[in-house]
Amino acid sequence: MKCGVLFMISCLLITFLVLSHVREVESKTKWGCDMNRPFPGKCGTNGKDTCISDIKKMPGAPKDLVVRCECSQRFVWKGYPPERLCKCQYDC
């Protein structure tokens, strides 16, 4: 019985010591705000970079805005010019 109690207490102490050394970590960037905008043209091979530059060229956008974007082709009816959809996230 003594051995069982000592074993349980030692397990609790070891668990407490391990958990007391764990530190909370914040993410480096917080991608909290989403922006979905259509732009003319196709994505091509550098669609992400094109979306980022188009978002930064928007009126009122800060020049030092850090954005992460994905580019996808948008459905358009036959006879209309191609469009791409930029799905972007930025720190708000």
Swiss-Prot record:
Disulfide feature: 33-92, 43-71, 51-86, 69-88
One of the record's GO cellular component terms: extracellular region
Protein known as: Defensin-like protein 226
Gene encoding the protein: SCRL2
UniProt xrefs under PANTHER family: DEFENSIN-LIKE PROTEIN 226-RELATED, DEFENSIN-LIKE PROTEIN 245-RELATED
Membrane-spanning intervals of the chain: none
Localization terms from the record: Secreted
Keyword tRNA processing: no
Leader peptide range in chain numbering: 1-27
Classification via InterPro entries: SCRL
GO BP: any one term: signal transduction
